[in-house]
């Protein structure tokens, strides 16, 4: 990854929006302990966010993406706000209920989570859209079109299990626990958090 330039072919005017997903990396890892790949990826994501904020490119950054966004805005992450693998209740704020990405979600909905660190304070120049008991900053908006989400709306129960399996070396839980969580989550009728992705695409897409 340290050899890949993700922005080499990126032109702001050619895209409707950008999705930045999670990763096994922890932003709060001391700089001296980060791999070259992690440092390069973080740098590339920060550069992309800078372009997006300057050019008005819509972005939805989830998990690791939110943590890099918070750091870019001057707010650190902490293991104090990590969440164990499982389902948690997400509470939409008043600003969130007025936002097009969350407007059709209930005031409280369940999402699958599992992250070592989180953001404890709302970063400067951003609006808090959603929160949870153990992780105060679950979703923010910066400006009109850059979003960060600690939960991963792109992951339904099946994809959540695949992600945990792929990141098993990073300490994301044992297979038995994941199987139980996924079984319980799959019993619900709808992947409610997935509406965030759908609404992002619908609201910002253009030909």
Identify the residue ranges that each predicted region occupies.
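Alpha-helical elements of Rossmann-like donor-binding domains used by nucleotide-donor carbohydrate transfer enzymes
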Residues: 17, 47, 127, 162, ...
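Glycine-rich, phosphate-binding/catalytic loops in enzymes
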Residues: 34-38, 76-78, 129-130, 165-167
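Acyltransferase
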Residues: 155-207
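Flexible gly/pro-rich beta->alpha loop and the following alpha-helix that scaffold active-site loops
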Residues: 1-60
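Pocket-forming structural segment of enzyme catalytic cores
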Residues: 73-158
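Gly/Ala-rich beta-loop-alpha elbow adjacent to hydrolase catalytic centers
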Residues: 61, 65, 70
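Active-site metal-binding loops of divalent metal-dependent hydrolases
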Residues: 23-24, 66, 116, 153
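Short aromatic-enriched loop/helix-cap "lid" or pocket-rim segments at secondary-structure transitions
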Residues: 14-15, 32, 140-142, 159-163
